[in-house]
């Protein structure tokens, strides 16, 4: 367990946004399903992305890390056709995206697949897939509360009805898989679709690799079978969910300029810009992708987090220092992330002096003038909680003690390097200091 003592003080300087984790998952999968050689540039080797790389290796892709790119030989190439093992183990580590994307993909191959993982991953629901397996006679067994899932059987084309309000990862997993089946398929969304931005990223990546899918207003997706992922060179754009930490730092009087962001991005977490503007920030777009921030007193608002769940922890920090009451609604899904994020946000920010009321599907946040600090806080072993608390420390009256900071490696391994380069002041802390 690593512990940092982090001191107050504003951040100042320029930071390069780390590559998008969401796009990297999708780029690696599409390239690995391809028919030749792809080169993926600007990729961040976080724990989650390494899990997806290793998972696609387990399915037969040949993937090597070069100096400036990831070299991927797709499973449909002649070199890889006999590379897959009949009985394979796919280690997802703690990556929910890896698990939910790869479960249906694994069902296009003969033999059996065993999925294992760590942390909270065994608590992530997979009932959507179990229903499909039961309907198609695909054998599966699992241990409740622990990720040890075994699957044997071939997925067949057809019509699939999926809820849109559980996780878009199930929909993406099926969309990746169905074009490779022999016949045509249809995916019907039976409820309002949350996290549309993630579906847009999936469809965009698949289109970039030559796959065609008809999207009928996010209510149904028509997928032709017997398609081929066409290998290509691919660059991962900057990650808005990570840029959000420094945008909020700017809202709290830091002076950080964030570059390498695609201002036309399809990322759902780009909504951080619109949310902060509603909270009375002025955000300036610079030609090279920088976002310059001019700060004003923050105002309260109502935030629907259904389309951008990953930025809710750090947005909650900004709301804690707004004038008035902010309501963050439709965020019940955050309870089944790396931790119960609603509970973690409320408990840890309240320790610092915030005033947050946690409800089943929402957070009610009454703004305060200052955060006191001077206490020990815990990341809950969740990367987004750890980074949010680090940003919170910059405006506290006293230093904070942050426990379990290493979890940042899940998505942004260089976060504290960037934090330090911007003037962040912290050091390892030992009990009794």
UniProtKB/Swiss-Prot annotation:
Stretches that traverse the bilayer: none
Subcellular location, record wording: Cytoplasm
GO MF, one annotated term: 3-phosphoshikimate 1-carboxyvinyltransferase activity
Annotated 3-phosphoshikimate binding sites: 21-22, 26, 167-169, 195, 310, 337
Alphabetic keyword roster: Amino-acid biosynthesis, Aromatic amino acid biosynthesis, Cytoplasm, Transferase
E.C. numbers: 2.5.1.19
Free-text function comment from the UniProt entry: Catalyzes the transfer of the enolpyruvyl moiety of phosphoenolpyruvate (PEP) to the 5-hydroxyl of shikimate-3-phosphate (S3P) to produce enolpyruvyl shikimate-3-phosphate and inorganic phosphate.
Subunit structure of this chain's protein: Monomer.
Protein's name according to its UniProt entry: 3-phosphoshikimate 1-carboxyvinyltransferase
Taxonomic source organism: Clostridium botulinum (strain Eklund 17B / Type B)
């Amino acid at each position: 367990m690593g512990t940092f003592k982090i001191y107050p003080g504003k951040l100042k300087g320029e930071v390069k946004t780390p590559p998008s984790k969401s796009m990297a998952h999708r780029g690696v999968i599409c390239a690995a399903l391809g028919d030749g050689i792809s080169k993926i540039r600007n990729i961040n080797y976080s724990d989650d992305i390494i899990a997806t790389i290793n998972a696609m290796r387990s399915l037969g892709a040949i993937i090597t890390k070069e100096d400036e790119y990831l070299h991927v030989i797709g499973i449909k190439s002649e070199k890889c056709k006999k590379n897959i093992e009949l009985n394979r183990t796919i280690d997802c580590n703690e990556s929910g995206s890896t698990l939910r994307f790869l479960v249906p993909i694994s069902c296009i191959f003969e033999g059996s697949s065993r999925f294992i993982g760590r942390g909270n991953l065994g608590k992530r629901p997979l009932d959507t897939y179990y229903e499909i397996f039961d309907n198609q006679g695909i054998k599966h067994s699992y241990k409740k509360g622990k990720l040890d899932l075994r699957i044997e059987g071939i997925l067949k084309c057809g019509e699939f009805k999926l809820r849109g309000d559980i996780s878009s990862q199930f929909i993406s997993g099926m969309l990746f898989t169905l074009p490779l089946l022999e016949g045509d398929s249809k995916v019907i969304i039976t409820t309002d679709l949350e996290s549309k931005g993630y579906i847009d990223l999936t469809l965009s990546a698949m289109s970039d690799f030559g796959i065609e899918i008809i999207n009928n207003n996010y209510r149904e997706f028509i997928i032709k079978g017997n398609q081929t992922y066409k290998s290509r060179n691919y660059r991962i754009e900057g990650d808005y969910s990570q840029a959000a930490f420094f945008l909020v730092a700017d809202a709290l009087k830091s002076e950080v300029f964030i570059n390498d962001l695609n201002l036309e991005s399809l990322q759902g977490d780009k909504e951080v810009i619109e949310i902060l503007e509603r909270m009375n920030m002025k955000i300036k777009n610079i030609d090279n992708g920088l976002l310059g921030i001019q700060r004003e007193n923050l105002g309260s608002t109502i935030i629907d987090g259904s389309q951008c769940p990953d930025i809710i922890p750090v947005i909650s920090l900004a709301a804690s220092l707004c004038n008035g009451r902010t309501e963050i609604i439709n965020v019940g899904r955050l309870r089944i992330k790396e931790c119960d994020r609603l509970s973690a946000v409320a408990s840890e920010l309240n320790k610092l002096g915030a005033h947050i009321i946690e409800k089943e599907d929402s957070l009610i946040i009454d703004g305060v003038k200052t955060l006191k600090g001077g206490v020990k806080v815990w990341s809950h072993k969740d990367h987004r909680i750890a980074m949010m608390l680090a940003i919170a420390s910059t405006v506290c009256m006293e230093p904070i003690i942050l426990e379990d900071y290493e979890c940042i490696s899940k998505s942004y391994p260089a976060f504290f390097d960037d934090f330090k380069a911007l003037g962040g002041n912290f050091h390892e802390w030992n009990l009794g200091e």
